[in-house]
Amino acid sequence: MKDLTERQRKVLLFIEEFIEKNGYPPSVREIARRFRITPRGALLHLIALEKKGYIERKNGKPRALRVSKSIRNKIPLIGEIRAGEKREAIEYLEDYIEIPESFLSSGYDHFLLKVKGESMIEEHICDGDLVLVRRQDWAQNGDIVAAMVDGEVTLKKFYQRGDTVELRPANREMSSMFFKAEKVKILGKVVGVFRKL
């Protein structure tokens, strides 16, 4: 999955969703219109997807393509998050990992982060785990969130009282961090944890 660019991934997802909804694949012009690119640009994406083995096309025939490798449940792993002190935000695509559909919330984007540190061990989130994050910009008290403060990202339990946000570790040996609410940006809520045994 590392071989797909972000745009190619989006084009492939669009093709899969279009086929599921309509029963036939989109035309080159429909792809171009959806992504606000030229038909030639759309065609180049299709050629790249074909070369990489994700679709098969029959030259010269409109709508003559089929998906040979689905990425519907492949979620981007976009780096590490510190379960400890804040860490500089690093969002770069490392890989795509297939996640069972039952873990995914319909209508939401998701991403994976690799956990570094031990501040969430009492919630059974350990160093080296992958956390599945549902992308959203809000949280309820007690939610485990990926949050950004001053350009740095951390994984903590979220609590808000008035205009103060507490980012609380799940480790009795560590202290909470307190911030003005406007300084805290919620990136998403943790909805799953994956661990290699």
From Swiss-Prot:
Marked site positions, Cleavage: A83, G84
Catalytic reactions on record: Hydrolysis of Ala-|-Gly bond in repressor LexA
SUPFAM superfamilies, A to Z: LexA/Signal peptidase, Winged helix' DNA-binding domain
Active site: S119, K156
Alphabetized InterPro entries for the sequence: LexA, LexA-like, LexA/Signal_pep-like_sf, LexA_DNA-bd_dom, LexA_repressor, Peptidase_S24_LexA, Peptidase_S24_S26A/B/C, WH-like_DNA-bd_sf
Molecular function as annotated in GO: DNA binding; serine-type endopeptidase activity
The enzyme's E.C. designation: 3.4.21.88
GO biological process: DNA repair; DNA replication; negative regulation of DNA-templated transcription; proteolysis; SOS response
UniProt keyword terms in alphabetical order: Autocatalytic cleavage, DNA damage, DNA repair, DNA replication, DNA-binding, Hydrolase, Repressor, SOS response, Transcription, Transcription regulation
Residue ranges of DNA binding: 28-47
Top EC group: hydrolase
UniProt record similarity statement: Belongs to the peptidase S24 family.
Function text: Represses a number of genes involved in the response to DNA damage (SOS response), including recA and lexA. In the presence of single-stranded DNA, RecA interacts with LexA causing an autocatalytic cleavage which disrupts the DNA-binding part of LexA, leading to derepression of the SOS regulon and eventually DNA repair.
Complexes and interactors: Homodimer.
Name the record gives this protein: LexA repressor
Organism from which the protein derives: Thermotoga sp. (strain RQ2)
Organism lineage: Bacteria, Thermotogati, Thermotogota, Thermotogae, Thermotogales
GN (gene name): lexA
